[in-house]
Amino acid sequence: MSDLGAVVALLLWGQLFAVDSGNDVTDIADDGCPKPPMIANGYVEHLVRYQCKNYYRLRTEGDGVYTLNNEKQWTNKAVGDKLPECEAVCGKPKNPADAVQRILGGHLDAKGSFPWQAKMVSRHNLTTGATLINEQWLLTTAKNLFLNHSENATAKDIAPTLTLYVGKKQLVEIEKVVLYPNYSQIDIGLIKLKQKVPVNERVMPICLPSKDYAEVGRVGYVSGWGRNANFNFTDHLKYVMLPVADQYDCIKHYEGSTVPEKKTPKSPVGEQPILNEHTFCAGMSKYQEDTCYGDAGSAFAVHDLEKDTWYAAGILSFDKSCGVAEYGVYVKATSIQDWVQKTIAEN
């Protein structure tokens, strides 16, 4: 059984639930757990109930309760001898973000409000963001992955050049990088870790939504390790609160404007913001606070009050605004949901 689960002991209505002994269930008739007394017109059943540690939940079609049968096998009425699994909880930070001021310099995340936020360092020590979506996979942008790589670079070329941190500067090893097939139109890539990361209050994935949360006016939170108001990379995770903007206004804002292209190496994704049906904009041009260089790859996190769960409505793709009256551009999570699930299942 996984060390994320445990077996608990309960004596309830004459039914004995087996003793908790870590990952091993003791013989119920040994000296550590004596046989219960018999009752008239009744009998004793030996039952175990599987439970998960904090920040994990039981995944099973049954109820997690197993009975010892005559063949001395633990079975569940619904799933037989198939054991349940403990899967990581997503989108349930212990200390969720408060409704605070929007600041480019950022509000310090001292409480672990964004446990899905990862820090990625690419070639030549450039800091960018990534977003944990389960225990072993993260989303980031194709632009981030191609930083300081030539347009001919492959995913295999890129993976060894990246350094990734989760939680409080916890270094994790990267197994592979997977680029979205049409990354010139949908600026997204996936990162697979060599090992699953233990989930706790500092490290927790954000949930991917089944519906589109990128509605005009909806407020989301974006955390990151990008440049601050002095254009220096920060050593502390910061966050900003931004509203989803009208797409027409955003497109109109960027019409005719360009971002200087780097001469070498040239990225196959390009430097300009990608605006299409798979993206949305956030930020309002009358404000002078926003995301900045190095924040790309971070989630536009929204709080569903009914479910009390945080979802990634999008992933920040274009982060060049830096408080100069421009919009940030995000890839919609709903546009990549099927690809993400398929890629994870195949790898």
Curated annotation (Swiss-Prot):
- Kindly state the tissue distribution recorded for this protein: Expressed by the liver and secreted in plasma.
Q: Would you indicate the residue range of the signal peptide?
A: 1-18
Q: Where in the cell is it found?
A: Secreted
State any GO BP term from the record: defense response to bacterium
Please list where the region (Serine protease) is annotated: 103-347
Q: Glycosylated residues: list them.
A: 125, 148, 152, 182, 232
User: What InterPro entries would the database entry show?
Assistant: Haptoglobin, Peptidase_S1_PA, Peptidase_S1_PA_chymotrypsin, Peptidase_S1A, Sushi/SCR/CCP_sf, Sushi_SCR_CCP_dom, Trypsin_dom
Question: Keywords for this entry?
Answer: Acute phase, Antibiotic, Antimicrobial, Antioxidant, Disulfide bond, Glycoprotein, Hemoglobin-binding, Immunity, Secreted, Serine protease homolog, Signal, Sushi
| Domains as described in the record | The beta chain mediates most of the interactions with both subunits of hemoglobin, while the alpha chain forms the homodimeric interface.
Complex and partners: Tetramer of two alpha and two beta chains; disulfide-linked. The hemoglobin/haptoglobin complex is composed of a haptoglobin dimer bound to two hemoglobin alpha-beta dimers. Interacts with CD163. Interacts with ERGIC3.
Role description? As a result of hemolysis, hemoglobin is found to accumulate in the kidney and is secreted in the urine. Haptoglobin captures, and combines with free plasma hemoglobin to allow hepatic recycling of heme iron and to prevent kidney damage. Haptoglobin also acts as an antioxidant, has antibacterial activity and plays a role in modulating many aspects of the acute phase response. Hemoglobin/haptoglobin complexes are rapidly cleared by the macrophage CD163 scavenger receptor expressed on the surface of liver Kupfer cells through an endocytic lysosomal degradation pathway.
Q: What is this protein called?
A: Haptoglobin
Which species is the source of this protein?
Papio hamadryas (Hamadryas baboon)
